[in-house]
Amino acid sequence: MAVKVLVVDDSGFFRRRVSEILSADPTIQVVGTATNGKEAIDQALALKPDVITMDYEMPMMDGITAVRHIMQRCPTPVLMFSSLTHEGARVTLDALDAGAVDYLPKNFEDISRNPDKVKQLLCEKVHTISRSNRRIGSYARTAPVAAPAPASTFTSQAQTRPAAPARAAAPTPAASQSPAPKRKPYKLVAIGTSTGGPVALQRVLTQLPANFPAPIVLIQHMPAAFTKAFAERLDKLCRISVKEAEDGDMLRPGLALLAPGGKQMMIDGRGTVKILPGDERLNYKPCVDITFGSAAKSYGDKVLSVVLTGMGADGREGARLLKQGGSTVWAQDEASCVIYGMPMAIVKANLADAVYSLDEIGKHLVEACV
């Protein structure tokens, strides 16, 4: 059965080109279009699409407000189009926080030329998020939706570090069957993720105390223009410190370093971060396998690694190296994943020492390390 898609954009050109690209795939059916957020809500309720592609800047109602309403009234996987700018990154992160599953850069030049790479990427994203966890609405903010704001309104983040997680609590998935972890003198916590990762990392890291005793490295598949904004966002929400990693940074307790987009991050035995150019032969920049592999070489059995929601199998080979060195590997459970791909690869390869729900992982990190 074809994946039913609703295309939402105030640009007639972009709406038409996205519809043409998707309709050229016989396994995808464009069932409707909308020009603003209000129309998107009405069409989502009427057409019940499998996936919605959504612009942000639109008249009547912006895309983020529309996503919040859709997640409350008819939870549907949403693919956001975003600009590759710092401000575009902040807006995209707001959309993911509201419940969108994934995003794509909005590039008029690329889409007008209609290169094969754009067509392939768009169709792959649509197919992937159509299979995402239909409980996705439970991972959006649970606060009541406010009256629609003008499209130009942007809610700024609070400037003070909160004493507790800033997100409203979402419904908690059933507890996993893995036992609580045993305490061990870990020298490093390494967390890798992809689709669904921005919200998942926020949920995990906001549970950690400011005096968390182990250094943390984060590998999130994300463009270069987005990682700095994402690190800044996490730093404002968490009690630990979070920053985008730079070459020469030193690991230290209570600090999480986020791998920069478009590059690779490695760690040496002295706790020094090495940032390397992204290898074009690798599918992911940053790549979880690269960072996990360097951690295995430098820290032996003293690494606690966690693989969260995401498509594909990045992290599996790095986790294999960590296991061979005696380190610990956790995977997020299927029920709480947006996309059960990367964690599934860990589980199927028999590399997982424990499988926990998203809401358990932060608590268990504290139990294992503090």
Curated annotation (Swiss-Prot):
InterPro entries: CheB-like, CheB_C, CheY-like_superfamily, Sig_transdc_resp-reg_Me-estase, Sig_transdc_resp-reg_receiver. Residues 179-370 form the CheB-type methylesterase domain. It is an enzyme of class 3 (hydrolase). GO terms for molecular function: phosphorelay response regulator activity; protein-glutamate methylesterase activity; protein-glutamine glutaminase activity. Residues 150-183 are annotated as: Disordered. The keyword Hydrolase applies. The active site is at S194, H221, D314. It catalyses: [protein]-L-glutamate 5-O-methyl ester + H2O = L-glutamyl-[protein] + methanol + H(+); L-glutaminyl-[protein] + H2O = L-glutamyl-[protein] + NH4(+). Coiled coil: none annotated. Residues 150-180 have a biased composition (Low complexity). It is found in: Cytoplasm. Its EC number is 3.1.1.61, 3.5.1.44. GO terms for cellular component: cytoplasm. Phosphorylated by CheA. Phosphorylation of the N-terminal regulatory domain activates the methylesterase activity. GO terms for biological process: chemotaxis. Residues 4-121 form the Response regulatory domain. Keywords: Chemotaxis, Cytoplasm, Hydrolase, Phosphoprotein. CDD domains: CheB_Rec (cd16432), REC_CheB-like (cd17541). The modification 4-aspartylphosphate is found at D55. Belongs to the CheB family. P.putida strain KT2440 does not have a chemotaxis group 2 operon. Contains a C-terminal catalytic domain, and an N-terminal region which modulates catalytic activity. This is Protein-glutamate methylesterase/protein-glutamine glutaminase of group 1 operon. It comes from Pseudomonas putida (strain ATCC 47054 / DSM 6125 / CFBP 8728 / NCIMB 11950 / KT2440). The lineage of its organism: Bacteria, Pseudomonadati, Pseudomonadota, Gammaproteobacteria, Pseudomonadales.
